[in-house]
Amino acid sequence: MRKLIYIIVGIAGILGALSRYYLGLTIHEFWHHTFPLATLLINLAGCFLLAWLTTYIAKLNILPSDVITGIGTGFIGSFTTFSTLSVETIQLINHSEWGIAFLYVSCSILGGLIMSGLGYTLGDFLLKKHLTEGDHL
């Protein structure tokens, strides 16, 4: 059993969680509305990054697979948060903010799919460009 992967994922997870916390605080400094913008932006960025990572960086073989796993599962996994999305939605519903709750869930799901698609498209484009320039995987 490779114990190093657990350390890599754990450290990356700590960094992802701290990044989410800091970015959330930063966004809350200028966003003072009911809509949970910080969680939405963080989750959308994570969707883009994970798709790009798995489509492009992982296939270049420039990083060991343990590092790719650490970034994807550890950093991005702890950077994004489905549980916060769920709790914030319930809080909005409990405060009768039905419209905002619907908008939040809709933006999260559709936006996540769009950002994942963009990350995949960019990764695929960069990979094809990399391969046509004579570099091989």
Curated annotation (Swiss-Prot):
Na(+) binds at residues 77, 80. The keyword Transmembrane applies. GO terms for biological process: cellular detoxification of fluoride. It comes from the Bacteria. Belongs to the fluoride channel Fluc/FEX (TC 1.A.43) family. Fluoride-specific ion channel. Important for reducing fluoride concentration in the cell, thus reducing its toxicity. The chain crosses the membrane at residues 4-24, 37-57, 67-87, 98-118. Keywords: Cell membrane, Ion channel, Ion transport, Membrane, Metal-binding, Sodium, Transmembrane, Transmembrane helix, Transport. GO terms for molecular function: fluoride channel activity; metal ion binding. The keyword Transmembrane applies. It catalyses: fluoride(in) = fluoride(out). It is found in: Cell membrane. Signal peptide: none annotated. It is a multi-pass membrane protein. It holds the Pfam family CRCB. This is Fluoride-specific ion channel FluC 1. GO terms for cellular component: plasma membrane. Na(+) is not transported, but it plays an essential structural role and its presence is essential for fluoride channel function.
